[in-house]
A protein has these predicted regions:
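Glycine-rich, histidine-containing beta strand-loop boundary motifs that form or position
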Residues: 10, 54, 80, 121-122
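Short loop/turn motifs at secondary-structure junctions
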Residues: 20, 46, 72, 113-116
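Glycine-rich, phosphate-binding/catalytic loops in enzymes
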Residues: 23-27, 70, 134-138
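Conserved beta-loop-beta/alpha segment of the NTase-like Rossmann-fold superfamily
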Residues: 75, 81-160
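Short, well-ordered coil/turn elements that cap or connect secondary structure elements
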Residues: 1, 71-73, 145
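Residue-level recognition of the N-termini of beta-strands and the immediately preceding loop/turn
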Residues: 4, 48-50, 74-76, 148-150
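Acidic donor-binding segment of Leloir-type glycosyltransferases
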Residues: 60-78, 84-85
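N-terminal glycine-rich phosphate-binding loop and ensuing alpha1 helix
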Residues: 2-67
């Protein structure tokens, strides 16, 4: 079976969430977190590797809540999103404390992911269909995007 990785962005701060780590907060009847559902759906669809993008300060809690358990059923790797891990020619602005976002998060796993992959947010639920579509389509790549004329306009063009 060809290797397909699920890359999970879980380094966010969750500043509006309050106490605790939003990505690790139980939501299911048996203490499941949202990632449990996404990982289950992805593995059922044929994914066979999980890469967690996290902050170094979350590593211990992250492994205790989900990482160690998932590593018993599939290959698991960790990438660490660091504020200073930027492409050549770029520098962190003075005073910046928040993660850069999606692009820099995915860049953090550049040495770990050599196979086709899908990127998801740790705290969003996707359902099984997107993962099935990724593993069964004949396309060489898939992308979902939303193009907005400007960040403050509600009128966006959606491309499936």
């Amino acid at each position: 079976m060809k290797k397909t990785a699920l890359v999970i962005m879980a380094a966010g701060i969750g500043s509006r969430f309050g106490k605790g780590i939003k990505q690790l907060e139980p939501v299911g009847p048996n203490g499941e977190i949202i990632m449990d559902y996404s990982i289950h759906d992805a593995l059922e669809a044929g994914f066979n590797k999980v890469v967690f993008i996290i902050r170094k300060d979350l590593e211990k809690d992250f492994k205790e809540v989900i990482g160690n358990r998932i590593s018993k059923i599939t290959e698991v790797e960790y990438a660490f999103q660091e504020l200073d891990d930027l492409p050549a020619g770029f520098a962190k602005p003075e005073g910046r404390t928040k993660p850069w976002g999606t692009g820099q998060a995915v860049l953090a796993c550049k040495g770990l992911v050599k196979e086709p992959f899908a990127v998801i947010n740790a705290d969003d639920y996707y359902g099984k269909d997107p993962f099935v579509n990724c593993t069964t389509t004949s396309y060489r790549s898939m992308m979902w995007m939303k193009l907005c004329r400007s960040p403050w306009q509600d009128s966006c063009l959606e491309t499936p």
